[in-house]
Amino acid sequence: MKCVLVATEGAEVLFYWTDDEFEESLRLKFGQSENEEEELPALEDQLSTLLAPVIISSMTMLEKLSDTYTCFSTENGNSLYVLHLFGECLFIAINGDHTENEGDLRRKLYVLKYLFEVHFGLVTVDGQLIRKELRPPDLGQRVQLWEHFQSLLWTYSRLREQEQCFAVEALERLIHPQLCELCIEALERHVIQAVNTSSERGGEEALHAFLLVHSKLLAFYSSHSASSLRPADLLVLILLVQDLYPSENTVEDDTQETDSFSLPEEYFTPAPSPGDQSSGSTIWLEGGTPPMEALQIAEDTLQTLVPHCPAPSSPRRIFLDANVKESYCPLVPHTMYCLPLWPGINLVLLTRSPSAPLALVLSQLMDGFAMLEKKLKEGPEAGASLRSQPLVGDLRQRMDKFVKNRGAQEIQSTWLEFKAKAFSKSEPGSSSELLQACGKLKRQLCAIYRLNFLTTAPNRGGPHLPQHLQDQVQRLMREKLTDWKDFLLVKSRRNITMVSYLEDFPGLVHFIYVDRTTGQMVAPSLNCSEKTSSELGKGPLAAFVKTKVWSLIQLARRYLQKGYTTLLFQEGDFYCSYFLWFENDMGYKLQMIEVPVLSDDSVPIGMLGGDYYRKLLRYYSKNRPAEAVRCYELLALHLSVIPTDLLVQQAGQLARRLWEASRIPLL
């Protein structure tokens, strides 16, 4: 029984997500009255009525005490509530079936906030404008928007329960150097260069292209002018792709089962793709004429031989951190194209429009006014000494230039009003007046951002790559990977197997190795679905081990939050262990430090909530400014017959082996 709600301080619903059980509980609470013809209130109204006391009491406490509650459980512990205020929007997560704890609910809220940022960019910093985006006046648009984010939350919950990469929040690569090299060359030549040399691209610049097989990254290529993409942003893009084309739709052969023991750890190289005269079903689809005697067979079996490929989705506007003109800029507008090659295999292209530099200017100005607001809130003295602040002089120059170039009447008059109050020697404005003017300028800058990047988004009729150019890229990549298609789909389910580790590491049942500097992980396959299985099979043993691994991930996070970087304990017939450590670029282990202890209501540990590991690396690097520092994690499951000293020794050897393997550049 689950629910997520985003509301204003007045209990106006901006977004909600519920499962069937929660909806049923609402129907029981707001059951039919004596007049059976009287309709039940809309679900949105039911939620507003149910949670209004919680919202109002929380906001009142915040106003009166400058503090409020962030978590509580109802009588008898039936339901758990977690609340977090982001800007002017209150996020609430509820669980009533004891399947999620406080950390899980808080993580869900932070992921939802991150998804809002990816979709709306810097508009999320302004309470009034984000309300307009999340609650459009048109009911049809509102339903469509809410259904989109509801679907994303369902997809996130499914991936977190099924995929190791989402459980630990790290990227999982398909390990096959030869194929990866082939794909990188194809992405460079047939995607990035093909788009950027086309005269019909309309100013759009192709920056990044990557291939996904289910939720695993096969290859990634960036143009020379592109800045690096954060692992967290790449992981959320995988989430978006999985929402568009869920992996369970992949056509799999139910009659033929394979297990990991039947798949040796060897690479194979199929023959080059056939030319235009190739025989087989592909040429028939492209308009060739099959032999007459084969025509009926082809018609009957076409769907079996060639699974239906999903249609490409419409281009969509997304916002990702990037460098613009060698300056870091948060939430730069990009256009995302998801081009499915086959069910389960997708090509993703990211482009940037010529107006991207405007995002940098607006971001710098809004950041400057935010810092100015912070200074003004320190007291009246801060307002009096405003002109002497170096920050203000730089901000004034930037804003004068922007207003002159933009020429918008509204922001021009607001800026003149602000300057009259801030820099007047005879009648300087008070801190409260300056704060009010500051907020007004920020809102107008945010409105310009919204006008340029949201109202002109590709899905709202804005500019994007022509369809035939997208089709060309999709066709060329299909041709390149035709012979590898079946291998890739199997490889994605059997990426790494435990067989190759059992001889050197007896007693090892499972492991997850994460390079937190690059945000990438390595782990043996752990599938226990009806159609796919790992070495442990499909029975209760596979599900049992998976439950152990997921439980270890949660426990390791809780202990890391309390400052522990090593964990070793016995649970039944298993030893569970967790290690976090730092190394330099040469692979030498660095001296361990005491990591910060975090409160229970702090940002969740991971990449999607607030990129905890990037902050941890910065914290560690303070005392080593001249040395590149890397952070690693290892989670392992051993049989309890293994002595603990041997287990620790194995963990070190396993980490060394995986470190050496990860040196192969695949991106």
UniProtKB/Swiss-Prot annotation:
Q: What is the name of the protein in this document?
A: BLOC-3 complex member HPS1
Q: Does the keyword Acetylation apply?
A: no
Q: Which domain of life is it from?
A: Eukaryota
Query: What organism is the protein native to?
Result: Macaca fascicularis (Crab-eating macaque)
| Record keyword Metal-binding present | no
> What is the documented function of this protein?
Component of the BLOC-3 complex, a complex that acts as a guanine exchange factor (GEF) for RAB32 and RAB38, promotes the exchange of GDP to GTP, converting them from an inactive GDP-bound form into an active GTP-bound form. The BLOC-3 complex plays an important role in the control of melanin production and melanosome biogenesis and promotes the membrane localization of RAB32 and RAB38.
GO annotation, cellular component aspect: BLOC-3 complex
Q: Which GO terms describe its molecular function?
A: guanyl-nucleotide exchange factor activity
Quaternary assembly: Component of the biogenesis of lysosome-related organelles complex-3 (or BLOC-3), a heterodimer of HPS1 and HPS4. HPS1 cannot but BLOC-3 complex (heterodimer of HPS1 and HPS4) can interact with the GTP-bound form of RAB9A and RAB9B. HPS1 and BLOC-3 complex do not interact with the GDP-bound form of RAB9A and RAB9B.
Motif Melanosome targeting signal: which residue numbers? 665-667
**Which of UniProt's keywords are assigned here?**
Guanine-nucleotide releasing factor, Repeat
[DE]-X(4)-L-L repeat extents: 45-51, 147-153, 483-489, 611-617
Q: Which InterPro entries match?
A: FUZ/MON1/HPS1_longin_1, FUZ/MON1/HPS1_longin_2, FUZ/MON1/HPS1_longin_3, HPS1
Q: Which GO terms describe its biological process?
A: melanosome assembly; vesicle-mediated transport
Starting at the broadest rank, the lineage of the source organism is:
Eukaryota, Metazoa, Chordata, Craniata, Vertebrata
Any Pfam family matching the protein: Fuz_longin_1
